[in-house]
Structures are given as C-alpha cells and as structure tokens.
From Swiss-Prot:
CDD domains in UniProt: BACK_KLHL20, BTB_POZ_KLHL20_KLEIP
Protein's recorded name: Kelch-like protein diablo
GO BP of this protein: negative regulation of synaptic assembly at neuromuscular junction; protein ubiquitination
Domain BACK: 143-245
Length: 582
C-alpha cells in the first residue's frame, strides 16, 4: 500500500450550516392537514354552534388572546371545548385558518365582522390588513360610517385616515345621507376641526342647518351646541344678516342669537378684533387665502384720486374695491390688525391730517380714526409693536421731522422723538425692532442718509447711507434686507435699486428695474417683491414689476386699472369668506 499523504496543518472539523426555507411552510401545511383530519387536535372552538377543531399550541403561538386563555388559570385552560360569544363564526373560522395557512382574503362582505374578531383575538396583522382595505374603500358616501366603525373598535390609524378624508372631502360628505344621520357628538367632532376643507364658513352653516332640518323635532335642542362651532365672525356680513340672522330657528334660541350678536360685533367693531380673538375667529387652514396687494390713491391725469384697487397674485387680476371718501396723493399706507390705514396726503387743494381705515371683510372705509396732529403729505407710514407711525412729510409750510404714533386701543396719536433730519418723500421700514427712515428730501435736495428709531430708548440714530440720493422712493423688507428702489435724485427719475444689510450696516446694489419710477410703491406679497406704479419722467405708470432674488432680475407682470404716482401700497390676507364683498 502506498504512503498516505498527511498535511502539517491542524485538522478543521467538517461543517455545513443549513436553514430550510421550505420547513415553516411545510410544517404549517402538515399541521393544517392534521387539523382537517381532526388528528392530534386538543381543543374545539365553539362559535354560535359551529365547532372548529384546532391545536392549542398553534392558536397560542398566533394569538395573545388564546395564549392567555390556555396558559393561565382560566377555566378554559382545562376545557376541551371552549365557547366564544359575540363574534361571527365565519370570521373566527377565517382567522383560525390564517393561523395555519398565513393566508386570508379580506373583502367587502367580511371586513365588518373580520376586524372586530381580529381585535378580540389581538391579531395585529389582520387588524392592519382590514384597516388598509377600508382605507382603500373610503369615499364621500361611506367615510363617516368607516370613521364610526374605526372609533368603535379603537383602530386609531384608520380613525385618523377617515377623519382626514372626511375633512378634505367635506363639501361632498355634507351631501351624503350618512352626514344627515350623524349623532350630534360626531357632527361636532367634524365641524370643530381647523382642517375642514371648505371654500367658506357659509358651507359649514348650511351643512349644520341641513342636518338640523333632517329631524327638527329631536335636534333643535342641540342647535346652539352645534352652532357654537360654526365660525360666524368669518361669515360675510350679507350672509350673517340675511341668512343666519333671519333664520326662524336661530332667532327663536337665545344662545344662538348671542352667537349672531358676537359675530356682528366682530364685523362692526374692527378695532376691537384683537381683543375678540378665539376659536370662532380662527380661519380654518384650507380656507386660508394668500396675500393680496392694495394700491391706494395717488396722482393720475393731473389730479389726486380716491380710487383703490387690489391685486391677487393667484389670479393676476386687479379689481376695484371701495374708494376712499377723500382723494389722496402722497398718502401713507400701512396695515394694522388686519385693517388698512390711509394717512394724510394731499387732495389736490389741501394738505390733509385725516385718516381713513379700510375693512376688507365689509369692503368699507371708515373715517372715525383720530387725525394726526399735523397735516402731512409725502409721509412715511409703518407699523411697529402694535402702533402706527407717521414719519416726516410736509404740511404745506415746511418739510417735517415730526414723528407721531397711533394707538388703536385709545384712538389717539402722540408725538415721539423727532428725526435728526427733515424728510418729505421719505420711505420707512421696520426691521429687527427698529423703524428706519430712508432718504427723502430735506426741502432743498434729495437725501441718501438713513436713520433708525429705537422705541425702547425713544431715540433716532444714523446708520450707513445709501449709495444714491433718493426722494419719493419705494422701500420694503424682503428676506431680512431693506430694499430701496427708484425715486428721484437731483436730476431725474431712477430705476436703480439697492438693499441694506443690518448685520453689516451696509448697502449693496441690485439690478435696476425695467422702468424709471418715482413715487413708486414697493411691497412683499406671498414672498415676492412688487414695484407698483410711479412716474418715469414722461408718463404716469400703471405697470407693476416683480423682483426675483435668485436671478437678480425684474420682470413686468401686468397693469393696474389706474395710473398712480405717489399712491400708497399695503398687503393683507384675503378675507376668509366665499362671498366677500370685493
């Protein structure tokens, strides 16, 4: 026999690791065969007289409910036949089949019995499958039923999804029979949500009244309980008075009349609105509209004008709204507490100290605001810390450095520290808690100087000047910079523009506008910077242009109805009613 070759390396043990992928499937299949043949079964589940043979160990491995039953001290742990009540026998058989096969079919005919059974047996996977099935079945005609079903069986995720679906599709849901059959508690749960997707609060009121009139005899006792969740202060005045206030059911209930009176006070007392805020004055999120731009007064065709128009960027339309009671050129405009203030100006003959206030909810101007202590045109107006500031201007005799501020709570103006320089045609802006007065004219020549007011110290101090002298310029705060555009220097109308960085106390140029614009309005609307109207040295302008900071470019984007020089601009959120009166 030949020699046997022996390696010098130490021997390694022979080993092969194997995990069978077929084994679990084969084992379950064979266990199910045993069950079908009633072999080695040690328990019978009796549901409504139907006897289902099974193995305790399989049921316990799959269901915490059965595990607690068979491994604890319950009487069922010693029984060979266990009766389970309040569960559908077909659903139980499907679930026990699943324990042996890992397969189940959920369909419209069984989901309503399968989900409660899965909840009882604590089969989380089947609960999830049933909920997923119901999510896919959601539509405006059944979402309320599915929502109630989910709530009954504590299916939080399905309840959340059904709620979200109901809120998003409320305009269709309110037309369904399910809606008319809602218990009062579920109705309140739905209409109290901030997420309710409606075009206006009028739709919510109409839905509530349709629900009420479906069964007036039983439901009229709940009218006040339900109406307190309708946000009546957000209704249009016409609808509030003509529809809500005249409804016989509403008029016959004292608590409902109080809700209507509350809404009327909110609409009729705009200055008091900051003190009247609450759940009923909060707009629902889906109905919150974007910002709109107002162009107020100005000079056109050789005379001051009273006209006012507003621009909606979503539609790119300019529409006329109620005019002011007086013609005003060189008017100062600002928004305080969702109301638009027009301060001073010149009516073509006289310098003005009167103020008008516009309420977009009613499309009306009111003249009950206290006048400024001085007549002012070419005045700068801005809001800081809840006060309205009037800065500089001219009174027909001299250029002013006077500054005063308006307290809407007291309806009173009071003087604060004057500027260090007299300024007419001044632009003002608020940034970082300071009030900036930018450029203008001292009565002799245009200015490039800038000063800012600290309300904590009641003091003005100079900051870095602009690179260009500018009077009758436009300015606005955009992305934490102060932008100054257009105006007029010693010689001509300007198209140039620059911006101020408060962190470096420096000005830097940006690209010029497409047109020269003196007496231009500048405002930020929905995150975009708009330059409005003005005078180019030859003609009064009705064009507007918008600035893109990413490309550092201006582009024209439409025209106003009126040409405007020295008009004011203000930005407000559009009213929350479908039938607002613009």
């Amino acid at each position: 026999m030949g020699d046997v070759l022996i390696s010098d390396r130490p021997p390694s043990p022979a080993r092969l690791s194997h995990t069978s992928e077929k084994h679990p499937r084969v084992t379950l299949t064979e266990l199910n065969v045993l069950r079908r043949h009633r072999e080695l079964c040690d328990v019978v589940i009796n549901v409504s007289g139907r006897k289902i043979f099974a193995h305790r160990v399989i049921l316990s491995a799959c269901s915490p409910y059965f595990r607690a039953m068979f491994t604890g001290e319950l009487e069922e742990s010693r029984q060979t036949e266990v009766t389970i009540r309040d569960i559908d026998e077909n659903a139980m058989e499907l679930l026990i089949d699943f324990c042996y096969t890992s397969h189940i079919v959920v369909e419209e005919s069984n989901v309503q019995t399968l989900l409660p059974a899965a909840c009882l047996l604590q089969l989380a996977e089947i609960q999830d499958i049933c909920c997923e099935f119901l999510k896919r079945q959601l539509d405006p005609t059944n979402c309320l039923g599915i929502r109630a079903f989910a709530d009954t069986h504590s299916c939080r995720e399905l309840l959340r999804i059904a709620d979200k679906f109901t809120q998003h599709n409320f305009q269709e849901v309110m037309e369904s029979e399910e809606f008319l059959l809602l218990p009062v508690g579920q109705l309140v749960d739905i209409i109290c949500s901030d997420e309710l997707n409606v075009r206006s609060e009028e739709q919510v009121f109409n839905a509530v009244m349709a629900w009420l009139k479906y069964n007036v005899a039983e439901r009229r006792q709940h009218l006040a309980q339900v109406l307190q969740h309708v946000r009546m202060p957000l209704l249009s005045p016409k609808f509030l008075v003509g529809t809500v206030g005249s409804d016989l059911l509403v008029r016959s209930d004292e608590a409902c009349r109080d809700l209507v009176d509350e809404a009327k006070n909110y609409l009729l007392l705009p200055q008091e609105r900051p003190l009247m805020q609450g759940p009923r004055t909060r707009p629902r999120k889906p109905t919150r509209r974007g910002e709109v731009l107002f162009a107020v007064g100005g000079w056109c065709s050789g005379d001051a004008i009273a006209s006012v128009e507003r621009f909606d960027p979503e539609t790119a339309d300019w529409k006329m709204v109620a005019p002011m009671s007086k013609r005003r050129c060189g008017v100062g405009v600002a928004v305080l507490n969702d109301l638009l203030y027009a301060v001073g100006g010149h009516d073509g003959q006289s310098y003005l100290n009167s103020i008008e206030r516009y309420d977009p909810q009613t499309n009306q101007w009111s003249c009950d605001v206290a006048p400024t202590t001085s007549c002012r045109t070419s005045v700068g107006v801005a809001v800081l810390d809840g006060f309205l500031y009037a800065v500089g201007g001219q009174d027909g005799v001299q250029c002013l450095n006077h500054v005063e501020r308006y307290d809407p709570k007291e309806n009173k103006w009071s003087k604060v520290a004057p500027m260090t320089t007299r300024r007419l045609g001044v632009a003002v802006a608020v940034l970082g808690g300071y009030l900036y007065a930018i450029g203008g004219s001292d009565g002799q020549c245009p200015l490039n100087t800038v000063e800012r007011y600290d309300p904590r110290q009641n003091k003005w101090c100079a900051v870095s000047p602009m690179s260009t002298r500018r009077k009758h310029l436009g300015c606005a705060v955009f992305n934490n910079f102060i932008y100054a555009v257009g105006g007029r220097d010693d010689c001509m109308e300007l198209s140039s523009a620059e911006r101020y960085n408060p962190h470096t106390n420096s000005w830097s140029p940006i690209v010029a506008m497409t047109s020269r614009r003196s007496g231009v309005g500048l405002a930020v609307v929905n995150g975009q910077l708009y330059a409005v109207g003005g005078f180019d040295g030859t003609a009064y302008l009705k064009t507007i242009e918008v600035y893109d900071p990413e490309t550092n470019q201006w582009r024209l984007c439409g025209c106003m109805n009126y040409r405007r020089l020295g008009g004011g601009v203000g930005v407000m959120r559009a009213p929350q009613t479908e039938n607002y009166m613009w």
